[in-house]
Amino acid sequence: NATKYKIVFKENAGAETLLKDFAGLQAGEVIDSSVMNLNSLKSFVQEAIEEAKSKNVLLSAHLKATMMKISDPIVFGAIVETFFKDVFTKYAETFDSLDVNPNNGLADLFDKIKGNAQEAEIKADIEAALANGPRVAMVNSDKGITNFHVPSDIIVDASMAALVRGGGKMWNKEGKEDDTVCIIPDRAYAGFYQSV
């Protein structure tokens, strides 16, 4: 029989957040779901950060945020927040007051801090995190746009195909190709690219 469903997140404390209001299902349709542990994801990301730094290679995240509009921006935000952990901790109150959300990437963060009294300090701390962490793959080296600027800039099926064709390399900030550690936190893609 045809029916309808809604998606509600229920916290351990009992509070509920409606994620999707009622939507229809046709007779015979199946709905599936999964669970993501944010702490495990951040540990995985931290390991990738450390691996890229120790091997002196680029770090890159590959998602499908254009199609996976709920989960992948959250995953992207976890990557951004883990890489810039000290920045997000230090400026937590400022970011909260400006409605900065790591799920939207650095471009949105830069836009929201524009004109803020701490803008220069925040930008300096972001630059320090980039200088002290592993080198980050670039979307546009000429414009200084990193892999962490916008969640939809690196689409896994296109970006990984280009990386494989390029021998496992992406662009660094100097506009040259460099070996890369890829964060692919999606089992639909990760297993395939792990074997490649």
For each predicted feature, which ranges?
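Extended, well-ordered protein cores
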Residues: 1-77, 86-196
